């Protein structure tokens, strides 16, 4: 359990999962979101997991950012309700799905996106790495390389989707897309700065940073 200075009613259920198919995780998020719309007093949730190789496209994203025929892809492709363009998930990338009731935090989507970035920036600081924000863009960069992508969906101020931090993934899948539709910014992973780093060790720091940034007490579930 990671404790913050907030009272116990600010519990957040932590689900530390391993490799999970994308559609299973998506259905789980939708179920948790619906429960919290119907019962607003339910606790916040943070899911941490990894996905098998999969491409996802935001609700308004363009197929022009795929460098292959989507009808002949070796990996799954799913168009989902988050914002943003195409991104790639695979093992070695730590994905976080917060299901938060922003009525208990702040009803401000820009604030929420900046808070998610702050979580990643604090994790990088543990390794003496300086994460950067870029004007008008969402995500976190290291020395000009994007190491964390963020895309969210909010319904009645309940959040779903979240962040994807490249820890030690096979980066070849990114070469088949224009990640997040950004043509002039390369993608990076923490392993390029910290050889041997693993998602397991990074999970601990993500949990700590998330608790601090959102003022929550994370409870293993």
From Swiss-Prot:
<feature type="binding site">
    <location>
        <begin position="162"/>
        <end position="164"/>
    </location>
    <ligand>
        <name>substrate</name>
    </ligand>
</feature>
<feature type="binding site">
    <location>
        <begin position="149"/>
        <end position="151"/>
    </location>
    <ligand>
        <name>substrate</name>
    </ligand>
</feature>
<dbReference type="Pfam" id="PF21948">
    <property type="entry name" value="LplA-B_cat"/>
</dbReference>
<dbReference type="InterPro" id="IPR045864">
    <property type="entry name" value="aa-tRNA-synth_II/BPL/LPL"/>
</dbReference>
<feature type="domain" description="BPL/LPL catalytic">
    <location>
        <begin position="40"/>
        <end position="218"/>
    </location>
</feature>
<keyword id="KW-0963">Cytoplasm</keyword>
<keyword id="KW-0012">Acyltransferase</keyword>
<feature type="binding site">
    <location>
        <begin position="82"/>
        <end position="89"/>
    </location>
    <ligand>
        <name>substrate</name>
    </ligand>
</feature>
<dbReference type="GO" id="GO:0005737">
    <property type="term" value="C:cytoplasm"/>
</dbReference>
<protein>
    <recommendedName>
        <fullName>Octanoyltransferase</fullName>
        <ecNumber>2.3.1.181</ecNumber>
    </recommendedName>
</protein>
<dbReference type="InterPro" id="IPR004143">
    <property type="entry name" value="BPL_LPL_catalytic"/>
</dbReference>
<keyword id="KW-0808">Transferase</keyword>
<dbReference type="GO" id="GO:0033819">
    <property type="term" value="F:lipoyl(octanoyl) transferase activity"/>
</dbReference>
<comment type="function">
    <text>Catalyzes the transfer of endogenously produced octanoic acid from octanoyl-acyl-carrier-protein onto the lipoyl domains of lipoate-dependent enzymes. Lipoyl-ACP can also act as a substrate although octanoyl-ACP is likely to be the physiological substrate.</text>
</comment>
<feature type="site" description="Lowers pKa of active site Cys">
    <location>
        <position position="146"/>
    </location>
</feature>
<comment type="similarity">
    <text>Belongs to the LipB family.</text>
</comment>
<dbReference type="InterPro" id="IPR000544">
    <property type="entry name" value="Octanoyltransferase"/>
</dbReference>
<comment type="pathway">
    <text>Protein modification; protein lipoylation via endogenous pathway; protein N(6)-(lipoyl)lysine from octanoyl-[acyl-carrier-protein]: step 1/2.</text>
</comment>
<dbReference type="InterPro" id="IPR020605">
    <property type="entry name" value="Octanoyltransferase_CS"/>
</dbReference>
<dbReference type="GO" id="GO:0036211">
    <property type="term" value="P:protein modification process"/>
</dbReference>
<feature type="active site" description="Acyl-thioester intermediate">
    <location>
        <position position="180"/>
    </location>
</feature>
